């Protein structure tokens, strides 16, 4: 057996630079292979996704076509009499809708017309209130001749014709919603608040008070 020579053994070992040079091409080859595999998988996934979307759209379109075809087929299966009844029912439904809309429009128009009518009456009555108050004072404090009394009665009837109601009388219960108390007078005989004197009459149309009656109120003594 020959003797082991350490120096010869070390000289025969490859250098580190040579090993690095051999490892680098191997690593580069591995990276290239991995990138190629990833690109192949991505390329395969994109057509698959596109195909899936296309299949979904096609299925939806087929469903809509089948639904339309089913409706058309249902109409085709009707007899001429059945088809006529179906069309008549559709026309009747449309006519009923139009009639309901017309009735609603007519009701709104009537309410609007009545509102304008009342506004016109209120404007005229408001302008004539001072004259009406003077007529009431003449009636209360002096006697009217027949001609003047006839004119006053015609005015009252004209306002009644348009739905104007005159209110406010001595002895009626005091109501703050229609009476304007200008004075409260204690009365030992009064059990509750009542109208003692009507200074100016009140007027209303229906439930709407145009002017509250101005009154003197007799109140119970505490």
Curated annotation (Swiss-Prot):
The keyword Ribonucleoprotein does not apply. InterPro entries: GrpE, GrpE_coiled_coil, GrpE_head. PROSITE patterns: GRPE. One of its GO terms (molecular function) is unfolded protein binding. Residues 20-71 have a biased composition (Low complexity). Gene3D superfamilies: 3.90.20.20, Head domain of nucleotide exchange factor GrpE. One of its GO terms (biological process) is protein folding. It is found in: Cytoplasm. Residues 1-82 are annotated as: Disordered. Keywords: Chaperone, Cytoplasm, Stress response. The keyword Chaperone applies. GO terms for cellular component: cytoplasm. Participates actively in the response to hyperosmotic and heat shock by preventing the aggregation of stress-denatured proteins, in association with DnaK and GrpE. It is the nucleotide exchange factor for DnaK and may function as a thermosensor. Unfolded proteins bind initially to DnaJ; upon interaction with the DnaJ-bound protein, DnaK hydrolyzes its bound ATP, resulting in the formation of a stable complex. GrpE releases ADP from DnaK; ATP binding to DnaK triggers the release of the substrate protein, thus completing the reaction cycle. Belongs to the GrpE family. PANTHER family: GRPE PROTEIN, GRPE PROTEIN HOMOLOG, MITOCHONDRIAL. Homodimer. HAMAP family: GrpE (MF_01151). This is Protein GrpE. It comes from Bifidobacterium adolescentis (strain ATCC 15703 / DSM 20083 / NCTC 11814 / E194a).
């Amino acid at each position: 057996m020959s003797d082991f020579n350490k120096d010869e053994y070390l000289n025969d070992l490859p250098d580190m630079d040579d090993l690095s040079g051999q490892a680098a091409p191997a690593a580069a080859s591995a990276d290239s292979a991995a990138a190629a595999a990833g690109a192949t998988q991505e390329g395969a996934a994109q057509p698959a996704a596109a195909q899936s979307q296309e299949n979904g759209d096609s299925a939806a379109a087929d469903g809509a076509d089948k639904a339309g075809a089913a409706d058309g087929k249902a109409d085709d299966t009707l007899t001429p009499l059945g088809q006529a009844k179906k069309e008549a029912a559709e026309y009747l439904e449309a006519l009923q809708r139009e009639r309901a809309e017309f009735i609603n429009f007519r009701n709104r128009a009537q309410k609007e017309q009545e509102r304008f009518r009342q506004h016109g009456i209120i404007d005229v009555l408001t302008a004539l209130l001072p004259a009406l108050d003077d007529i009431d004072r003449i009636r209360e404090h002096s006697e009217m001749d027949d001609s003047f009394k006839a004119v006053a009665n015609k005015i009252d009837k004209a306002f009644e014709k348009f739905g104007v109601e005159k209110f406010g009388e001595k002895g009626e219960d005091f109501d703050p919603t229609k009476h304007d108390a200008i004075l409260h007078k204690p009365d030992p005989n009064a059990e509750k608040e009542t109208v003692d004197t009507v200074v100016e009459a009140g007027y209303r149309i229906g439930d709407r008070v145009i002017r509250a009656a101005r009154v003197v109120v007799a109140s119970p003594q505490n």
